[in-house]
């Protein structure tokens, strides 16, 4: 007879191990499948690395603009225009000398060629010597003094002579009345060519090369042409290219630079066409 007994069934522990093995195989298969799928996906472009921002250029610190030094304004009150002893004294038909009989304390003879021996205040005398030497050195021309300081009494005689010759109205355009003359200050000189060319004390002297040099260069030595052409309504006198007035280099240079020709205009004084 055949053996009909049932076969022995695996134990519970064996079945548990089989289950673990099966699930392990399944897990490995799943993981492998996932890996395979990932491998088939297109590779993602790498994220671009951040470009370092350009270093911000440093804003230059503005250099402060230096405050310009103001140009000094000429001090018109540095000297008196009323004191007869001042180099800036203004004497005209409306402004007589404050002291009628004024006589400068520092009058000296001027060592230059002359027609009438000239006396001037020391500073003016020194300046005349320098100016006469300069025109000769620069051009070969020569100057001589025609007239310089006149006292009150001498001016009386001079003015009377012009009145006798021309009549008072015309004399007043040519010569100052006593007490109103710049010659009394010791700061004025009338110059002429050496040798005389026939225009002494006349407007025609302005056409000479001597007068042209004087007009252009007198300021260098502290002089101005006191009665310029075309300024009779202001100064009260006809054109006198030969009549030089010492005011000092500072004022003469300022007037030359600004182009202001008369003391009346420079110091903003009333015109003085008449007495």
Question: Model segments located where?
Answer:
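Extracytoplasmic cell-surface/polysaccharide-interacting catalytic and binding patches
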Residues: 2-148, 152-275
């Amino acid at each position: 007879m055949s053996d009909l007994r049932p076969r022995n069934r695996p134990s519970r522990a064996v079945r548990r191990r089989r289950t673990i093995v099966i699930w392990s195989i399944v897990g490995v298969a799943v993981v492998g499948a996932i890996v395979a799928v990932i491998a088939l996906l297109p590779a993602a472009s790498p994220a671009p690395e951040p470009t370092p921002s350009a270093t911000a250029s440093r804003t230059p610190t503005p250099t402060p603009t230096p405050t310009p030094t103001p140009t000094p304004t000429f001090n018109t009150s540095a000297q008196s225009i009323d004191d007869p002893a001042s180099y800036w004294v203004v004497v005209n038909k409306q402004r007589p000398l404050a002291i009628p009989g004024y006589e400068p304390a520092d009058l000296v003879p001027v060592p230059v060629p002359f027609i009438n021996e000239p006396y001037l205040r020391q500073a003016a005398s020194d300046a005349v010597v320098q100016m006469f030497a300069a025109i000769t050195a620069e051009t070969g021309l020569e100057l001589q003094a025609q007239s310089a300081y006149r006292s009150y009494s001498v001016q009386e005689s001079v003015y009377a002579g012009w009145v006798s010759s021309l009549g008072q109205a015309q004399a007043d355009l040519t010569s100052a009345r006593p007490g109103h003359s710049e010659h009394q200050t010791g700061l004025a000189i009338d110059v002429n060519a050496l040798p005389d060319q026939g225009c002494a004390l006349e407007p025609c002297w302005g056409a000479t090369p001597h007068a042209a040099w004087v007009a252009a260069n007198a300021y260098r030595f502290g002089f101005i042409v006191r009665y310029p052409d075309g300024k009779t309504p202001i100064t009260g006198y006809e054109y006198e290219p030969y009549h030089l007035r010492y005011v000092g280099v500072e004022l003469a240079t300022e007037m030359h630079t600004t182009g202001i020709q008369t003391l009346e205009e420079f110091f903003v004084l009333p015109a003085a066409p008449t007495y």
